[in-house]
């Protein structure tokens, strides 16, 4: 998904300046810079760069596909429970897997410097980039809001069933597809001499507007929402820490929140350079860069976006591991409190007084009970719920 400076498209293909100059009316299409395929002769430096990028992407593809398939198998095996985290992790792993499956087409285009997959390939592979990118960030936004609700408004999450969460996950894919449809319909295969290029049917202004819109829906909008949620969570945890210290209560473990935030930050770190590169090509076309430099930047941004999907499975494993430990601790604590005298009264009282007027300090008993109601019991052998 890394376009060249001159071509303003996305998935990854490395288009050179000469390719851009061939487009009608000087249209600076950054369409999958590499998807379109460069036309200038290959130098030794270009051959070495192509070989290195092909090897790196192939390695990323193998590692990422194995990791995400493993995640999907494990998550689907234990998806019988209504644990929200597992429903969303399945969606993230599926998006990563679909994105990684485009690597063979990218590598083939890099090596041959031509597009061999026809008009349907243009539409599917170009659209797949935007589809999976939006599905991932939308799912991460929902996960952040779920954790926010579980910490600050746990009673609101009790009524949310597994079916509700699956519907929400389906909605993220439908919204991502809706945002991707314009590219799917506009992209087409064009012959330029002996080369095949994937180009949009619309003009440069429409293309720039569309890419700017997608930057807003994939980076800016979700970033503002997630940032606001974590700022409020940080404030709530700080207030809760003060209250917990005074009342000698133990704070809920925030490791799950940290891991979700880590996945979000990794997404931004990998995709923000790609988007800045694309928008720079759209709004500042006269860049003092040689074709070789543009290709190298295109290669690096491509590796970053695929690297995100390659690293994510390891973070998903840590996330689910910490989530299971978190639930076990909550259930053990709840079980011991329920066995004590008057536990029912104290539980109901804690639910009523979950959010205190002094700044929403967290009630550990209420949160424990809510997590147990929302999630099925964790078996003693450590299986996923």
Swiss-Prot record:
UniProt entry tagged with the keyword tRNA-binding:
no
Query: The organism sits in which domain of life?
Result: Eukaryota
| Stretches in topological domain Cytoplasmic | 77-86, 146-166, 232-257, 321-385
GO BP term (any one): regulation of blood pressure
Question: Where does it localize?
Answer: Cell membrane
Primary location recorded for the protein, binned into one broad class = membrane
PROSITE patterns per UniProt: G_PROTEIN_RECEP_F1_1 (PS00237), G_PROTEIN_RECEP_F1_2 (PS50262)
Similarity comment text for this entry: Belongs to the G-protein coupled receptor 1 family.
> What is known about what this protein does?
High affinity receptor for urotensin-2 and urotensin-2B. The activity of this receptor is mediated by a G-protein that activate a phosphatidylinositol-calcium second messenger system.
Protein name, per record: Urotensin-2 receptor
């Amino acid at each position: 998904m890394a376009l060249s400076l001159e071509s303003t498209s996305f998935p990854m293909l490395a288009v050179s300046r000469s390719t851009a100059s061939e487009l009608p009316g000087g249209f600076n299409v950054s369409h999958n810079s590499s998807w379109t395929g460069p036309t200038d002769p290959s130098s030794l430096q270009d051959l070495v760069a192509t070989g290195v990028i092909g090897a790196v992407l192939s390695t990323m593809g193998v590692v990422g596909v194995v990791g995400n398939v493993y995640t999907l198998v494990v998550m689907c095996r234990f998806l019988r429970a209504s644990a929200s985290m597992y429903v969303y992790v399945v969606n993230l792993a599926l998006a990563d897997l679909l994105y990684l499956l485009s690597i063979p087409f990218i590598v083939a285009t890099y090596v041959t410097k031509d597009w061999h997959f026809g008009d349907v390939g243009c539409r599917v592979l170009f659209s797949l980039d935007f589809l999976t990118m939006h599905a991932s960030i939308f799912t991460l936004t929902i996960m952040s809001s779920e954790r926010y609700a579980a910490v600050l408004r746990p009673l609101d999450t009790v009524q949310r069933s597994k079916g509700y969460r699956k519907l929400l996950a389906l909605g993220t894919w439908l919204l991502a597809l809706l945002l991707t449809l314009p590219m799917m319909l506009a992209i087409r295969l064009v012959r330029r001499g002996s080369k095949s290029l994937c180009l949009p049917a619309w003009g440069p202004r429409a293309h720039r507007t569309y890419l700017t819109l997608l930057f807003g829906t994939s980076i800016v909008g979700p970033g503002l929402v997630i940032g606001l949620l974590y700022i409020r969570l940080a404030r709530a945890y700080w207030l809760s820490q003060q209250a917990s210290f005074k009342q000698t209560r133990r704070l809920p473990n925030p490791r799950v929140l940290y891991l979700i935030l880590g996945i979000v930050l990794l997404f931004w770190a990998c995709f923000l350079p790609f988007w800045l590169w694309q928008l720079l090509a759209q709004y500042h076309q006269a860049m003092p860069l040689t074709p070789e430099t543009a290709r190298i930047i295109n290669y690096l941004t491509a590796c970053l976006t695929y690297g995100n999907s390659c690293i994510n499975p390891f973070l998903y494993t840590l996330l689910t591991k910490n989530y299971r430990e978190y639930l076990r601790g909550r259930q053990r604590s709840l079980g011991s409190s329920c066995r004590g005298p008057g536990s029912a009264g104290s539980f109901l009282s804690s639910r009523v007084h979950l959010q205190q007027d002094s700044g929403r300090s967290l009630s550990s008993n209420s949160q424990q009970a809510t997590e147990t109601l929302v999630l099925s019991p964790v078996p003693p052998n450590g299986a996923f719920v």
